[in-house]
């Protein structure tokens, strides 16, 4: 899936898919194994779930244009963190008899006209 960097007509959904693809590629290049994408629960959606050695990583992806009023990091509200945590608990209860060690990361993508910058924040919850 390839999108032009400055396509202002791209839908929010397509932009989100593009951000998740960039994040998945970035995490894979840094040694993580993506095990699930777009996992839904009654609390919300988990963008990516990855394996980092023996740690299961729940990943929130945020993509923002450089001109946006709110940065990618600022767009992750306490309410969003709470929903991510609840969604992760729901996922673990449904998929594991004994939950593995887990952490919550965020991949922040700032989109410029000609390029993008990716920042990976580990352990963003608790």
UniProtKB/Swiss-Prot annotation:
> Which NCBIfam families does the protein's record reference?
PRK12497.1-3, YraN family protein
The entry's protein name is UPF0102 protein DNO_0639
Q: Which GO terms describe its molecular function?
A: nucleic acid binding
InterPro entries attached here?
Restrct_endonuc-II-like, tRNA_endonuc-like_dom_sf, UPF0102_YraN-like
Q: Which domain of life is it from?
A: Bacteria
Task: Tell me the PANTHER family matching this sequence.
Answer: UPF0102 PROTEIN YRAN
> Which family does the similarity line name?
Belongs to the UPF0102 family.
């Amino acid at each position: 899936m390839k999108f032009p960097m400055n396509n202002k007509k791209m839908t929010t959904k397509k932009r989100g898919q593009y951000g998740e693809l960039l994040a998945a590629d970035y995490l894979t290049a840094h040694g993580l194994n993506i095990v699930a994408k777009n996992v839904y629960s009654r609390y919300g959606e988990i963008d990516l779930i990855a394996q980092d050695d023996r740690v299961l990583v729940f990943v929130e992806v945020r993509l923002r244009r450089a001109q946006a009023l709110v940065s990618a990091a600022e767009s992750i509200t306490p309410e969003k963190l709470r929903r991510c945590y609840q969604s992760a608990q729901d996922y673990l209860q449904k998929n594991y008899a004994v939950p593995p060690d887990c952490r919550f990361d965020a991949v922040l993508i700032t989109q410029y006209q000609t390029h993008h910058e990716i920042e990976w924040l580990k352990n963003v919850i608790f």
